[in-house]
């Protein structure tokens, strides 16, 4: 008797499997936005240097005459090759001669430029706030933006190696619960990160657990379904990833502050952690690791949920051991 035969007896694709896959789909929908979150929270808006004539509230209209904002921008910031204001440079001195106004303002031929030493002004049409505008990750610091996603993926790789090994040693269920807790804490704290360094560390920890959860949902789904149903289970789980991406797009459209968006996608993880206490362990893993009593307990629970009362009553250790069951499972 192989494990798949035993699984068929307790219900290979019954109410239990449907509820299990449905829970994992909901979990994936809520988890997947964490992977691509920086597409929105790290969005780089249009920006230019802060210049006194335009952005200093103490400069009165008498100082600039009747010049428009476009005129003040023209004399304060040089143009790039596309004739648009440069994003990372400004004139050291206003270039009044560029307006072809003679005798109205002092003339100067000093066209030297300097970096944005006083900061930047951002276009907040799409997003009121992102981590880019929060910590000025532009110009010389623009490489730091990509470092956030790199750290998240590095955490995913390292977490997959460590937690993947632990899942085979101590079980899928306990590792899933641990990862849910770690992700809930790290992602929620990231919404209140006071510095960019703290934010990077928290996103690394979030990546450490996210991929492990997604991997274990696949494993548990496969280990609790029959071979003929596994392709359908995988397809449904993969579709839930796409739903998660669409959900994030809708949330990002409605929530334009990165901290609020971060907190919004993090809060449901707490609910998933609380719900994970009702998860079942893989009976296949329990039997392989000589935890026969626990394996029987989980199988009977599945049989009861699937309405297999006769199997629930006749399922014993002798039935599992019959025909060298352990050797077949391994």
From Swiss-Prot:
Q: Which Pfam families does this entry report, sorted A to Z?
A: Sugar_tr
Instruction: From the UniProt record, list the reaction(s) this protein catalyses.
Output: estrone 3-sulfate(out) + glutarate(in) = estrone 3-sulfate(in) + glutarate(out); 17beta-estradiol 17-O-(beta-D-glucuronate)(out) + glutarate(in) = 17beta-estradiol 17-O-(beta-D-glucuronate)(in) + glutarate(out); taurocholate(out) + glutarate(in) = taurocholate(in) + glutarate(out); 5alpha-androstane-3alpha,17beta-diol 3-O-(beta-D-glucuronate)(out) + glutarate(in) = 5alpha-androstane-3alpha,17beta-diol 3-O-(beta-D-glucuronate)(in) + glutarate(out)
Q: Where are the transmembrane segments?
A: 16-36, 146-166, 178-200, 204-226, 234-254, 258-278
Q: Cellular component per GO?
A: plasma membrane
The keyword DNA-binding is annotated on this UniProt entry = no
Q: Which GO biological process annotations does it have?
A: monoatomic ion transport; steroid metabolic process; sterol transmembrane transport
Instruction: Give UniProt keywords alphabetically.
Output: Cell membrane, Ion transport, Lipid metabolism, Lipid transport, Membrane, Steroid metabolism, Transmembrane, Transmembrane helix, Transport
Location(s) in or outside the cell: Cell membrane
Any one Gene Ontology MF annotation carried by this entry is: transmembrane transporter activity
Nuclease keyword on record? no
Q: Which Gene3D superfamilies match?
A: MFS general substrate transporter like domains
Tell me what topology the record assigns in the membrane.
Multi-pass membrane protein
Task: List the InterPro entries.
Answer: MFS_dom (IPR020846), MFS_sugar_transport-like (IPR005828), MFS_trans_sf (IPR036259)
Q: Please, which domain of life does this record's source organism belong to?
A: Eukaryota
Q: Which SUPFAM superfamilies match?
A: MFS general substrate transporter
Protein family? Belongs to the major facilitator (TC 2.A.1) superfamily. Organic cation transporter (TC 2.A.1.19) family.
Q: What does this protein do?
A: Renal transmembrane organic anion/dicarboxylate exchanger that participates in the reabsorption of conjugated steroids including estradiol-17beta-D-glucuronide (or 17beta-estradiol 17-O-(beta-D-glucuronate)), androstanediol glucuronide (or 5alpha-androstane-3alpha,17beta-diol 3-O-(beta-D-glucuronate)), and estrone 3-sulfate, as well as bile acids taurocholate and glycocholate, driven by an outward gradient of dicarboxylates such as glutarate or succinate.
PANTHER family per record: SOLUTE CARRIER FAMILY 22 MEMBER
Q: What is this protein called?
A: Steroid transmembrane transporter SLC22A24
